[in-house]
């Protein structure tokens, strides 16, 4: 099985788990399914390196499908709250988590594409978003198996935390890109000025 196939299978499993179980309120089984397939995201890159087939295409595919998986997770939660969950506020928060996660990733990718290091990790990145959301969803799902009912509060709290953290991370990255771009432009202007030959005034005189 090729690393790309592992990436595709893993993403398909995450999308299926999120969009089948979460809209029905089956948070525990949805989390179990998603977690099993998320591990493929850790395996595919290592497989490619071990097999000596790492490529730009593989990196692009992995990053792109990560965005698809993230969208499915928060989209599934939004569908639950828009339907049987009957909570428009949390539906909006889940959609915000979906959108902000995509934009946070884009700001870093776009900054790097124009030659900036984007030297900031941010408060909450993809790994933190997934861990916080999936742990909370799984624990909330235990409430349907007779666990304490207060566990059901963990998912709403987690969504608010992820939303706030993603907003802070977005601001951090935008500020960093603005600073780095200003520094890069200033350095480029200084380099151009230093390369421009100085003009000496012409001497005039009478023969």
How would you describe each model-predicted region?
Residues 1-33, 38, 72-207:
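Hydrophobic alpha-helical transmembrane segments
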Residues 25-59:
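Glycine-rich active-site/cofactor-binding loop and its immediate structural neighborhood
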Residues 45-92:
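Basic, amphipathic juxtamembrane/active-site segments
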């Amino acid at each position: 099985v090729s690393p790309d196939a592992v990436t595709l299978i893993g993403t398909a499993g995450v999308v299926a788990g999120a969009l089948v179980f979460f809209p029905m309120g089956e948070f525990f089984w949805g989390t179990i399914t998603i977690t099993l397939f998320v591990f493929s995201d850790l395996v595919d890159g290592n497989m490619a390196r071990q097999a000596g087939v790492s490529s730009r295409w593989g990196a692009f595919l992995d990053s792109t499908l990560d965005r698809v998986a993230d969208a499915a997770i928060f989209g599934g939660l939004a569908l639950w709250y828009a339907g049987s969950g009957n909570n428009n506020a949390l539906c909006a928060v889940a959609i915000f988590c979906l959108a902000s996660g995509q934009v946070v990733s884009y700001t870093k990718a776009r900054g790097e594409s124009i030659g900036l290091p984007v030297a900031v990790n941010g408060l909450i990145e993809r790994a933190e978003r997934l861990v916080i959301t999936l742990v909370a969803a799984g624990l909330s799902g235990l409430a349907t198996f007779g666990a304490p009912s207060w566990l059901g509060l963990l998912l709403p709290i987690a969504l608010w935390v992820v939303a706030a953290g993603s907003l802070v991370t977005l601001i951090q990255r935008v500020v960093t890109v603005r600073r780095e771009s200003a520094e890069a432009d200033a350095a480029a202007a200084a380099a151009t000025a230093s390369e421009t030959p100085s003009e000496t005034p012409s001497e005039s005189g009478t023969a």
